[in-house]
Regions:
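Glycine-rich anion-binding surface patch
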Residues: 1-90
Length: 90
């Protein structure tokens, strides 16, 4: 299942990401149509490393072992969808 709605992505926030630690925002990948959670404003197509680190930590806490790629946007999209799937199946 893809993260296609803000509500689904918010499930990630409810899983332990603290919105008070940074300015939270969602961006939509125009190619895949998936929402991606990020912090602050992306610079070009790059996403802040902070958000990737937080998402990776949440994945580890949820027992999700993910390979990372050189494409930060793709990696975060995969993490978001994996976490949402994990939450819905738990």
């Amino acid at each position: 299942m893809n993260a296609t709605t803000i509500e689904q992505v918010e499930a990630l926030v409810n899983a332990g990401l603290d919105p008070s630690t940074a300015d939270m925002s969602y961006i939509k990948n125009p190619i895949t149509g998936k929402y991606i959670l990020t912090v602050a404003k992306p610079i070009g197509n790059a996403l802040p490393c902070w958000s990737m680190g937080v998402l990776r930590e949440i994945c580890l806490q949820k027992g999700i072992d993910l390979d990372t790629t050189d494409n930060a946007e793709e990696t975060i999209s995969i993490m978001v969808n994996s976490i949402i799937n994990n939450l819905q199946n738990s």
